Amino acid sequence: MKTYNSTATRENEPHWSALQEVQLSYRNKIKATQRPKINMAEDALALFRSVWNEDEMELVESFKMLLMNNANRVLGVYHGSTGGTAGTIVDIRILLTVALKSNACKIIVAHNHPSGNLTPSPADLKITERLKEAAKLMDITLLDHLIITTNSYQSFANEGLI
């Protein structure tokens, strides 16, 4: 019989009774009809700006995700990462874990460019495509990816990049 672990033996098998069952829960104290609704990129931009630390906008790159239900009502905003002056780490598994845990049907992601350059980098385009495809497997729609600077923004959806 093939084992998953080449060092596995019968004496180090787990005691199944000691394992815990995984349980999901999600609590939101705001009624769905009272949550903000995102209709266009400008709505998402306003919400992202309201939670972004403006003092860091030109200092370090950060990545955030807006979580929405099927009616585009906001479930929450997740701060994915903060990096350096020229990049940040985006972990798709963690983003999708957060989206699934919050029962999001749609997501919009955003990151800032401290340089003020609104042009997406090849890495920006690649991570957007990978996130879009991974989310699709979970029946989650990536609606947009915004690049934000202190004075402006670019929407991948408005530019036909999603």
Q: Language-model segments: what does each one mean?
A:
Residues 2-28, 46, 71, 81, ...:
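Active-site-proximal loop/helix of nucleotide/amide-processing enzymes and allied scaffolds
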Residues 34-94, 98:
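Glycine-rich, small/polar surface segments that engage phosphate groups of diverse ligands
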